[in-house]
Amino acid sequence: MYLFHLCLVFACVPCPTVQASKLCLGWLWDMDIDPYKEFGSSYQLLNFLPLDFFPDLNALVDTAAALYEEELTGREHCSPHHTAIRQALVCWEELTRLITWMSENTTEEVRRIIVDHVNNTWGLKVRQTLWFHLSCLTFGQHTVQEFLVSFGVWIRTPAPYRPPNAPILSTLPEHTVIRRRGGSRAARSPRRRTPSPRRRRSQSPRRRRSQSPASNC
């Protein structure tokens, strides 16, 4: 339904339906919806990362297909991160179809404006979403949260009072990614070496030294 309203607004058709579409979309845009809250993060933390930090969509889609194609295309519910990736891929596919349709029915100038706007707004949001959930599946959700908080603190600290290099996700405490039965993955913290127990002395009775013949004299 919202895709239909977006199509009418971008087409700029002078009819009462466009006004209704703007009202409908205005109600949607005024809602304070943050899809990262349930994962312990927020839009604000992700916006601290620069725009060129996130890989392009083709690289993210290829990564998702290479690592989690079985889970994403299966019927089972693996995790909320898998569900979010599915929804992001479906939304981007539908948006691409809308852009294709509008490109065929609008002028070159209008098409260029629309494509630039989509890449700088919705395209960026899809890149952020895919990066966040793929990183949570790869490194662990808690590790990604620590990275976002650390980077947010680093970027807001004046340059003379902060380290020269920004935090890097791969240098944070590592988690071993293991695959459970059923295709799901879980993060396991590295094992700590426990001190080996001391060897107990043999409790067998000591042998008496045999007395030499000279001691009997």
UniProtKB/Swiss-Prot annotation:
Residues 189-211 are annotated as: 3 X 8 AA repeats of S-P-R-R-R-R-S-Q. Sequence repeats lie at residues 189-195, 196-203, 204-211. One of its GO terms (biological process) is symbiont entry into host cell. The keyword Electron transport does not apply. Pfam families: Hep_core_N, Hepatitis_core. Homodimerizes. May regulate immune response to the intracellular capsid in acting as a T-cell tolerogen, by having an immunoregulatory effect which prevents destruction of infected cells by cytotoxic T-cells. This immune regulation may predispose to chronicity during perinatal infections and prevent severe liver injury during adult infections. This is External core antigen. It comes from Ground squirrel hepatitis virus (strain 27) (GSHV). The gene is C.
